[in-house]
Regions:
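Short helix-capping and inter-helix turn/linker motifs at the boundaries of alpha-helical repeat units
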Residues: 18, 142, 187-188
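Conserved amphipathic alpha-helical segments that form helical-bundle/coiled-coil interaction surfaces
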Residues: 113-180, 191-199, 208-218
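Helix-capping and short linker residues that terminate individual alpha-solenoid repeat units
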Residues: 202, 221-222
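Short helix-capping/hinge motifs at transmembrane helix termini and TM-loop junctions
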Residues: 108-109, 160, 184
């Protein structure tokens, strides 16, 4: 079943074939990127028009988003975009450190030449976008965050754990929602951190790569907390 309204989102480049999946991805995208602000009441009638989906599809989608933590469901009041808080952000960042650093160590130790090639390509795309951001061109902020996501995913893709990759994706998207709320660029500091992680990973120094990654996430957390 196809839907003419289905469009690729930042974190999901290709349109999906089912209405339910595409509706889930599009609403999640709009929550992450602030089109649906924290605390917004999600009224089914309005969503039906916005996303060209049936009420039954929307209920299923909102329940799935609630199980992933992007939507809150309150008895008698319906669905809301999950509110944000500094404590929640700190918890998400700490969980991301635990999971992503472990996955990175596994990936560095297991990765083959295809993994190396994918990592080089992902870092190249991110590096070019960071140069654009540094020059003052901020017209492609969503593309910048896509390349950031693709780089972090490329780092850990060889961890050989589908479950770990799925859990990491949810944490990364939750963390990204906070970043998009403040949407400030850390500049050379973040770019250098990415290069340090990249260099350590290619050198197959799993412990150094994990340390650099933890520093990177921690610095990003402090930056985002200060901007909230």
């Amino acid at each position: 079943m196809h839907n003419d309204h289905v469009k690729p989102t930042l974190l999901n480049k290709e349109p999906q074939s089912t209405v339910g999946h595409s509706t889930y991805e599009r609403i999640k995208h709009d929550i992450i990127f602030g089109n649906l602000a924290p605390g917004t009441k999600l009224k089914l009638d309005g969503l039906k028009t916005m996303y060209a989906a049936s009420v039954s599809t929307l209920r299923e989608t909102l329940n799935r988003l609630a199980s992933d933590g992007f939507v809150s469901a309150e008895e008698q009041r319906g669905f809301f975009v999950t509110p944000v808080s500094k404590d929640d952000l700190s918890e998400i960042a700490n969980l991301r450190i635990l999971l992503e650093c472990h996955a990175l160590r596994e990936s560095v130790e297991n990765g083959d030449t295809d993994w190396e090639g994918d990592l080089v390509a992902a870092h190249h795309n991110l590096h070019l976008m960071e140069r654009r951001m540094k020059s003052g061109d901020e017209t492609e902020k969503e593309l910048w965050k896509r390349y950031d996501w693709e780089f972090h995913l490329a780092l850990i893709r060889a961890c050989n754990s589908k479950n770990m990759l799925e859990l990491h994706a949810v944490l990364f998207w939750k963390y990204l929602r906070y970043q998009m709320l403040v949407l400030t660029y850390r500049g050379d500091e973040a770019a250098q951190e990415h290069k340090d992680i990249f260099d350590a990973a290619l050198a197959r120094d799993s412990q150094a790569a994990a340390r650099r990654l933890e520093e990177h996430i921690t610095n990003g957390l402090v930056h985002t907390l200060d901007a909230m």
